Amino acid sequence: MEGRFQLVAPYEPQGDQPQAIAKLVDGLRRGVKHQTLLGATGTGKTFTISNVIAQVNKPTLVIAHNKTLAGQLYSELKEFFPHNAVEYFVSYYDYYQPEAYVPQTDTYIEKDAKINDEIDKLRHSATSALFERRDVIIVASVSCIYGLGSPEEYRELVVSLRVGMEIERNALLRRLVDIQYDRNDIDFRRGTFRVRGDVVEIFPASRDEHCIRVEFFGDEIERIREVDALTGEVLGEREHVAIFPASHFVTREEKMRLAIQNIEQELEERLAELRAQGKLLEAQRLEQRTRYDLEMMREMGFCSGIENYSRHLALRPPGSTPYTLLDYFPDDFLIIVDESHVTLPQLRGMYNGDRARKQVLVDHGFRLPSALDNRPLTFEEFEQKINQIIYVSATPGPYELEHSPGVVEQIIRPTGLLDPTIDVRPTKGQIDDLIGEIRERVERNERTLVTTLTKKMAEDLTDYLKEAGIKVAYLHSEIKTLERIEIIRDLRLGKYDVLVGINLLREGLDIPEVSLVAILDADKEGFLRSERSLIQTIGRAARNANGHVIMYADTITKSMEVAIQETKRRRAIQEEYNRKHGIVPRTVKKEIRDVIRATYAAEETEMYEAKPAAAMTKQEREELIRTLEAEMKEAAKALDFERAAQLRDIIFELKAEG
């Protein structure tokens, strides 16, 4: 069924999923602009949203606040919609260093993009899908509000080929070069084409295995086939094919000429300005860099960092709203914001963060002032582009609640698990009380998480627990990537019984073995003790049937009161449902393998664990770095960007130690 979403799932909606789906769908059909789904941890929010997408049948953009979540959502949605276009759109900078300059140390950092090719393919696959069909879901990080080329230009430059069409072979080659394809008869890869007599083979920018073979008879296209690029095996005949540009910043020749004139004019004005300020080094640097870029644009129609000239290429006035992925969607599209209490503040902050970094580059002659217009949307611009939007969170923020006419709740877990019980206990004698509670959990082979407010308190507590003979680990921000994952794995395996940390809301801490969460200094109002943070922290004990939370505090703050009441309210709803349906809560069974995918490379080589980096010979270290780099590329190819980023960090650490 072309153009319609087909949801494939081994189970039907259950618990309070059916009512949540019905309410959200009804709201969308009535034209409600903002809706909020308040879904408790582990209630199957992704499945609910998938049902909503399938029923309203609109192109959908799902925004997540980091690549880990985006990757997980992408995998889940791909399973639910195997017959539809589920795409993935993240910025190269989600993993790699953007261009920057540090004046204090006179350090210029070029943009570093190692696993660019895979991400680039996925981005092209996403934008081309939007022009070819309506049954499209794009899972994106917040970088989807970042500047992109003009969608009109992108659409107009598509090369459309049909069997029987009259076109000279050389005219086709010229058109391919215009949309940034390179002729390469030897190294045939994405974004290239090759020619053999009357046969032109094109490798689309959005593919990595299949290419298009166009066979001519004179000046007529005789047949079009889809071919395996490696083996040459014919995969199918095509009547029609659309070749999308190999860059999102493509521009027609006449527009490019105009853009180059405008860039030259801006360059002259800026050079005069810098020289008048006595900034001769900056002026020389800017002239050299910009003239080189202009030369590349004249010769190749492209240059490295072309996005910095996007305002000129699109002939937009200074300060105007940039084009972004949102402009590639049709007008009636739907936006889903996952974990909205974190994602919306991120969307809000992107413009300022980017502006500060670019301003330094402009001030020191690395970029023209127009580069400031290659930027993310401001939050107000983002709001103007919303057609209909659903915010999804266990703890929606004030913005979502203010804008949504009613909140749709999803409280019941398919596993029957309840929100944990909560105790508030005085701080006097809290550590000895905590030790008693931990020992009870150890007896039952369960684990404990303890959250403190300061680094010193965490360190002192860890030492004290060790002296009391408890197997404890301290998880803090300075711990290296690989170690962090190993500590979590060791907690699950029982090497540790307790994990002490300051911020337990970072990803990777949904551990079914944890039945007790202890919150020290619960009555100190602040970021980590706000009602939202408390509810999220309490949720860390909601994956175990014996889940319990102890807050150590001498007074009950407003945040504590709200968090406790909300948890009680949810627990009562869940208990009532379980009683009615005869459900017995069972702890989630989760393979320990899940947690340790990222240590795969280190386990493969065994070197990293068997020998500390300092003890390795130069040759051993280089060998390990090579292995890890290969593993990193494999991970990115498999879309496991979390692992790719972790491996990148490990490589960085190894190089630093060398």
From Swiss-Prot:
GO molecular function terms listed in the Swiss-Prot or TrEMBL record: ATP binding; ATP hydrolysis activity; DNA binding; excinuclease ABC activity
Domain Helicase C-terminal residues, every copy: 430-596
Gene3D superfamilies, A to Z: P-loop containing nucleotide triphosphate hydrolases, UVR domain
Positions of the UVR domain: 622-657
Alphabetical list of PROSITE patterns matching this protein: HELICASE_ATP_BIND_1, HELICASE_CTER, UVR
Coiled-coil stretches noted in the UniProt entry, renumbered to this chain: none
Subcellular location as annotated: Cytoplasm
Cellular component per GO, a single term: excinuclease repair complex
Role according to the record: The UvrABC repair system catalyzes the recognition and processing of DNA lesions. A damage recognition complex composed of 2 UvrA and 2 UvrB subunits scans DNA for abnormalities. Upon binding of the UvrA(2)B(2) complex to a putative damaged site, the DNA wraps around one UvrB monomer. DNA wrap is dependent on ATP binding by UvrB and probably causes local melting of the DNA helix, facilitating insertion of UvrB beta-hairpin between the DNA strands. Then UvrB probes one DNA strand for the presence of a lesion.
Family the UniProt entry places it in: Belongs to the UvrB family.
Descriptive protein name: UvrABC system protein B
Originating organism: Geobacillus kaustophilus (strain HTA426)
